Design a protein with these regions (language model features):
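Surface-exposed beta-strand/loop patches in extracellular or lumenal glycoproteins
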Residues: 143-149
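Short, well-ordered beta-strand segments enriched in hydrophobic/aromatic residues
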Residues: 128-136
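Short beta-strand micro-motifs enriched in acidic
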Residues: 120-122, 135
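An extended acidic
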Residues: 10, 14-104
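Short beta-strand/loop motifs in extracellular/secreted proteins, especially
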Residues: 104, 141-143
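Low-complexity, acidic Ser/Thr/Pro/Gly-rich terminal tails and inter-domain linkers that flank the onset
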Residues: 107-120
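Conserved small/polar residues in nucleotide/adenosyl-binding loops
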Residues: 153-160
Length: 162
């Protein structure tokens, strides 16, 4: 199977990258959906979206997970959020490549730090695994994670019989 890949020039161009989306499912109604730069641009986007009852609704349980690299008492926020037409923080500038083979993988570079993030939905279970690999760092490096849980819902699409 061939990989779906995007490079730094494509990822750094928000007009381009915000139009490219990724989707991974657990095959029982849950999914992860966002853009290739991890900026949620649609109401149904999120890292963990799942039905939690027998209703016709899915719930965005985890909207985003913001990562911050800390090195030499300096912080580098890797996140990208859209607020009323503006984008902050602009962490997409640290993304060097995106690859979907079959797991969405994003590589960040901040100075001498190279960090790889892999996102995997577990089939038949509503579980998301995110693995971070510190590929290279020239000095002590810490990673801070901040989850953005939310609890809004939307109706699931239905199949209608003719």
């Amino acid at each position: 199977m061939s990989a779906l890949t995007f490079d730094k020039s494509e990822l750094g161009n928000l007009e381009y990258s915000l139009q490219r989306e990724m989707l991974a499912t657990d095959r029982i109604g849950g999914y992860m959906s966002t853009t290739i730069v991890c900026c949620n641009t649609r109401r149904y986007h999120g890292l963990m979206v799942a039905p939690i009852d027998d209703s016709d609704r899915t719930y965005v349980l985890l909207s985003a997970l913001d990562e911050t690299i800390i090195q030499h008492d300096q912080t580098f926020n890797l996140a990208l959020h859209r607020f009323q037409g503006t984008y902050e923080p602009r962490g997409h500038k640290y993304i060097t490549d995106f690859e979907y083979t079959p797991t969405p993988t994003i590589t960040y570079r901040v100075g001498g730090v190279i960090l790889k993030k892999e996102m995997l939905w577990i089939h038949k279970r509503t579980q998301l695994m995110i693995r971070y690999t510190l590929v290279d760092a020239h000095s002590e490096t810490r990673l801070r994670l901040r989850p953005f849980p939310v609890s809004y819902t939307h109706l699931r699409a239905h199949e209608t019989k003719a």
